[in-house]
Amino acid sequence: MEENMLARLMTDPAVEFFSPVIDRTVHLAQGETVRLLGVDPFLDRAVRPQLARNRPGALSFLLGEKAVLADVQLAKEMGLHSGDFLETNRGKLRLVGTFPNPSSEPLILMDIAHAQRLFGLQGKVDRVDLILNEDSGFRSRWANGFRIQSGQQRRATLSDMLRAFRLNLQALSLLALFVGIFLVYNTAMFAVVSRRKDAGILRSLGANRREVIFAFLSEILFLGALGGALGGIAGYFLSRFLTNLVAGTISNLYFFLRPVIPEWSWWILLLGTLLGCGASFLGGIFPLAELVRVDPIQALQGRTAVRGQRKMARNAALAGLAILGISLALLEASSIHVYFGFASAFALLIGTSLFTGLTLIKLGPFLRWVFNRISGLPGKVAAGNIRQNLGRTAVAVAAFMVALSMSVGLSSMIGSFRQSLVWWMSTQLQADLYIGKIGEAEVPENFYEELKSMKGLGGVDPFRNVQVSYRETSIYVSAVDPAVLQKYTNFGWLKGGNENWEPVKKGGVIVSESFYRRFKVQPGDRIVLNGAQGPAEFKVAAVFYDYSSEHGVVMMDRSTYLKTFGDHTINSLGIFIDAGNPHRKELLDEVRKKAQSLGLPVFTRDQLHGNILSVFDSTFAVTRSMRVLTIVVAFFGIAGALLTLFMERQKEFGIYRALGFSTPQVAGMTLMEGLGMGLVSFLLSIGVGTALAWVLIRVINLRSFNWTIFFYPEMGPYLLAAATSILASLGAAVYPIWKVYRTYPQMQIREE
């Protein structure tokens, strides 16, 4: 905004104090981006007293051309002292003192006049911070041409910006927790099975069923509570690592956020304990109920009753079918709120996990045929063991299937999003050079005019992107040259086509998909924006695909923007040169030199695309971490199932060896059981993971961010899931195989 409007502010009766601000960023030589505020130290004292306290070097701060103050934390991190120089992309800045900064954001202060010269903003300010004695009257007087936002509104805007991001992060965490519960369930079940003989001894000595259940359940709950408490502590330390990843993602996408070490709370311990106890109870109560119903002699002999398992598998499948029906209903309800979409994804995983028992029954003949071809009789026995011990194998397969499905679903979603982003860049960001960077430096308008008249250049697109208020929320307005974009780009159109640039040249606008979905606006509708001279009405010509902002973008001709907002600022320039121009390289070099002489950053098309993809990849670092954690959890689930089967069937193994099976053959049976469960888990994850990817892409992301991600099927996620299932199955079988080699048949069958 123009500096001369400060005179009007001084005479406004509602204004108690005001402070003009230059708000920009600079790149330090160390690679860190730091916010620089240009302020008037006398006017700013009333608005930001916390920054004015103990501010040394005031005279040097005012008189030094490139004198700055750094916040205490930033100076400490960089090892800077008064008199040192900061190397930045705007030249050397001399540190004349430090100040306490209550914010977590690294901050540099500079006198506003010096900041205006540093950024080429003579006669302009970025914003004015105010303290008012009356709000409504002030807003009515300054509504035209200015964006007025209270501190509370700004906090609400920032919270709204993070709402979808936070919601998605919480949902992914719950999915990982869902897989972890399977592990606790498996572990509790193993704890019961491994004590089967102890239960038989207690029953034979006169203990009744209630006493046995109480004794065993107390032990399981204690172990679950201990494990949950340790998990809570481990989760807290893991959060200290993940905080850096999340803060980096927020800084890249929304606003700078310095990572702060999470505070310890005893609620973490309590929550972990409750989750551990709950999962342990569910994992232990069913095998305990089975255990106390078994005759004490059978318990002493270690034999497992397998009656009714097929019926239970069919009943579980029917329950799973009902839950899948609920999942579809929740999917339909996701148009009301994205929470229903997340609930649908959970129901999908729960419902399909209940099909594992029936799947193992149906695939039993196939596994027997495959294993028989591989190793003969031991293979057939291994396939039969998987099918006959559904109470153990089905849970392990369900846990592993859910983990692999999450891996396939998340990988497919990330890969599809990345491919959609690449497609979007190839259609919309096609300039040969990009000059300037939002938040760092404005492109002088005379430089734009100079390049515009430069011979040999096909076109110059002056881009301005500014946040404005619309329907009591925030959107972005972008000013462009539609003639240049119509000639050199091929926007992805949701509704409309390249011919819709014509109405934009005549004062119309095009809107992004996120704006179209967020505000239910159709081509032909009219929208009203608050311009410099009052409300201005625009006709929507078309809707284009866009991934730059989930809050919505309204794009208009620069001439329309100037007429509406009176803002001549240019954030960046896109330079286009015809592909057949023989002097293409020389022209690009000349433009680059001119821009660099003005201190403007220059990027080639490939560099810009690479920077965007780098930000994208860092954004999903947390998602990838969670995917790895779920695989690790499921690995232990398979290992627990194999160990449980081994403990239950030690006598059976002894009989096999007494009948002539060699130790390697018995070990091979254990290995094949692990591979069989891994194979079934993988086969199920193909369908479930693809369905989960569809829900994430077409429902959750669309509802959360209001943009379309195109599904790009890739073999990578499925090959990764296949490799994971093989490696995890092999790794999970190592300990049971080791136990086979360490156990003698005469010890296993001594009671027969």
Per-segment meaning from a language model:
Residues 1-35, 61, 76, 136-144, ...:
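Hydrophobic, regular-secondary-structure patches
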Residues 1-178, 193, 425, 546-629:
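Membrane transport/envelope proteins' first extracytoplasmic loop
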Residues 203, 207-223, 306, 393, ...:
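Amphipathic cytosolic juxtamembrane alpha-helices at the membrane-cytosol interface
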Residues 185-189, 221-254, 267-293, 321-334, ...:
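Small-residue-rich transmembrane alpha-helices
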Residues 292-308, 738-752:
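Short cytosolic juxtamembrane segments of multi-pass membrane proteins
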Residues 139, 164-167, 221, 265-287, ...:
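Alpha-helical transmembrane segments, especially those used as permease/efflux helices
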Residues 34-77, 449-459, 463-523, 537-539:
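Short beta-strand boundary microenvironments
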Residues 163-200, 221-235, 275-282, 351, ...:
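Hydrophobic alpha-helical transmembrane segments of multi-pass inner-membrane transport and secretion
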